[in-house]
Amino acid sequence: MILQPETRRSRFPRICVMILLGLLPMAIFAHQIHAKEEGAQAATTWIVIRHAERAGNADQLTDAGNRRAELLKQLGTAIRTTAIYSTDYQRTRETVTPLAEKTDVAIQIYSPGKLDWLQQAQSEHVGGVIVIVGHSNTTLPIVEALSGYQAKPIGHDEYDRLFLLQTGTAEPTCLELRYGESSAGAPSADAA
């Protein structure tokens, strides 16, 4: 195997992820401390993603999908995940299993066709950090139900979109990010 030296271009996504991993926990906890000082209800943080890469119609993750699941584990551990929700498909469960094992948080199964469980999740995990993994056609309805944010559709070859939401505040917020390696259908984070 020939090893190529890292170029500035190939290091950029890693640097962005490291910065995100470093700053995100501080921002979340600063907000929670501020809310407690004011006597307000603590905000609930949500990370909503599509499952990681799979090969064609296969249900298990590819090597790229497993790498993305490992990255999610790092992010979810850094921000102290308190709840994990997944549909009952192998690809969604495999996406969050490394995080569940690292944090010792059980994966709770939800039905992708219904959104009524979101209200119960919100009340059970007030002030917590909830990770939800869905599918290309179910992730955005969850994001919209929680925050009102309407994102462009997720392509069938897009796996790197991550939605960071906060609810329980005066105005729900949503930040759309990209994490890990760029998906085939996604614009590169380090594109010129």
Segments the model singles out, each with a brief description of its role:
Residues 129-131:
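Noncatalytic modules at the cell exterior or secretory-pathway interfaces
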Residues 29-126, 139-192:
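Active-site-proximal alpha-helix that buttresses catalytic centers in soluble enzyme cores
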Residues 18-27:
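Bacterial N-terminal signal peptides
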Residues 6-19:
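Bacterial N-terminal signal peptides that target proteins for export
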Residues 133-135:
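Short beta-strand segments
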Residues 2-4:
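Cytosolic-side transmembrane helix boundary signature
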